[in-house]
Amino acid sequence: LKAVGLENHEVLKQFNIRFENFNSATSYSGPAALRLLKSVCGQPSHEDLYEGRNPDCEIMNRLARLGYNQHVFMDHSGKYDNFYQSLRHLAGLSPQLAEMKYPKRYDSFDEEPIGDARAVFKDYENTIAADKGGRSATFINMIALHDGNRFANKRRLAPFKPRAQAMLDDLGSLITDLEKSGRKVMLVVVPEHGAAEKGDKVQVAHLRDIPSPAITHVPALVKFIGVTPADSPVAVDTKTSYLAVSSLIGRVLETNYFGKPEGEVPLKDLVKDLPQTHSVSENANAKVVNYKGKDYVKMDNKDWREYAK
C-alpha cells in the first residue's frame, strides 16, 4: 500500500484496532489461510500445517461449538492448488462453497474468473440478513489483489494500485452497509501477505519465494460495527501474528463486548497483553527470522545468513 500511495486510504481510518507489527508468517495464500483458520493453538511450522487437523485449534469450529453458523465466500472457485479443499481437510472449514456466480471483475493468471468484490460482499450481507438474527462466523477469501491478474477479458495486466483502490473502496461500502443494517459485527481484515511491489537486494519485485519482512509485515485490522468505542482507535505495537487475532475474538466473547453502546470494556483493556509471536516466517523452502534486530534467511538445508535489504 505504501508503494502505491494508498497507506492512508480513508477506509483504513475507520478501523478500531490496528496491529502495527503483525507477521503473516508466509508469503503464499494457502498457508496464510491455514494459519488463520488454525490460529487458536499458535504458530506451527510450515510442515506441521499440513499434518492433519486438530479441531481445538480451529477458530471457525470453536465458534461453531458456541452456536455460530458458519459461512464462506470467495471471489474465486477455490480450485487452484486445491485451495478450498485443503481448508476443509486441514482446517475443518465446513460450509460448502457455492459455484462462482458473481460478475467477473478480473481474470487470474490461470484464466480463472475473479468475481466482483462488491457482489461478494452483497451476497454475504444478504446471507446473514436471512439468518434472522442468528449468530454467524464468516470466512471470506479474496484474490483480487493477487499478482498476475488481468482486467476482465483483456490481455493487459491490471496494475496493483487500481485493484487495491477498488478493494479498499468496496471494503468501505461493506462497512457502510453493515452499519446501516443494525447488526453487531466484528470485522477482522488479515492480508494473506504483501504484494511485493518493490524488490530488494535478494528478490526482485513480485517474487515471493522468500517470506521477507517486507512481504510478511501486513496491516491486520479490526472494526466493531454496532458499538462506538470511546477510545478508538488503538494500536497494538507488539510483535503479533494469528494467535493474537483468535485471542482477541475470544476476549470479545468473554467480555460480552457488544453489551454496551460504547463497548463493554475499553479497547485498551481488550487488547492489553495479547499474545506476542516472535517474527518467524516460512515457506516450503525458505525460513526467515528476526534475531537481535537483524533478519536472517535459511534456504533449504543451507546455513543461516543475514538477509540483505
Where in the sequence are the language-model features?
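Active-site-proximal alpha/beta segments of enzymes that process anionic O-linked groups
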Residues: 1-151, 242, 251-253, 262-265
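A long, amphipathic alpha-helix that forms part
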Residues: 5, 115-132, 150-190, 197, ...
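Residues that flank catalytic or metal-binding motifs in active/ligand-binding sites
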Residues: 32, 214-218, 241
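Short acidic, glycine/proline-rich loop/turn micro-motifs
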Residues: 41, 149-157, 200-203, 230-234
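Membrane-interface soluble catalytic domains
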Residues: 56-57, 61, 65, 78-82, ...
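Polyampholytic, low-complexity intrinsically disordered segments
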Residues: 144, 162, 172, 286-288
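Histidine-centered active-site microenvironments of extracellular/periplasmic hydrolases
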Residues: 179-184, 190-228
